Amino acid sequence: MQTRPGPGLHKIVVTDQDGGLGQFGGGAWLHDAALWPMDPSTGRPMLPIVMLTGLFLPTAYLPDDRVLTVFASIERSGGVDGRSSLRRLAVNQQGESDKLAQGHSKVLLHRRAAQEVCVGDSARLLGRHFIGLQPFDDHDMAEELEDEDSGAGMSKQLGRPCWLQDPIYMSPRYYFLAQFVEAELGRVDSGYAGLFGDGTGYLFADQRARKLGDGVAAGHFFIQFT
């Protein structure tokens, strides 16, 4: 049965069971392949990183028939992600926030199709894994509140980002939706190793997502690594 999580903060875990919350990797659930974002530098299809459904949060944050899919321009050559493409995705200090407008990642709000599609070389796709959520325990909450600038360092939904470099301050239009820790994903699937430069991916969603149309940008995604 597909249900929303309860109130409070949750860790993101990888599971074999589809609970209707979303998935890492795989293709994209696009009803129109023309919506698939292309890398502005190379013209090649971007890589789907994660898809989140409207059930991911305790309250409705998306229209009922929509999902958010995060795409990123990551070059994967011989199993190693090109450092140049990772640097384009990295926002390590506030002065680099202009990278968010350069189009090397896209948080796409779209209707969910009946099946996945793939544009380009399917061999480039990440392995598909379903998303699960586990409520924070007392230890997790203590870690979340311990530092003045950063929250807990696991993959999680909501809360505060755990910054690996400088804190990044976003426009009030966007809120922190989730962070994804590469090391946790890599322990489940070695194909994720190096995806974020051994770092973390940060997803910020548009406060207005419930009012936006189909096939539009509805947030920002970037990474930090040390």
Segments the model singles out, each with a brief description of its role:
Residues 1-226:
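Preference for intrinsically disordered or flexible, low-complexity segments
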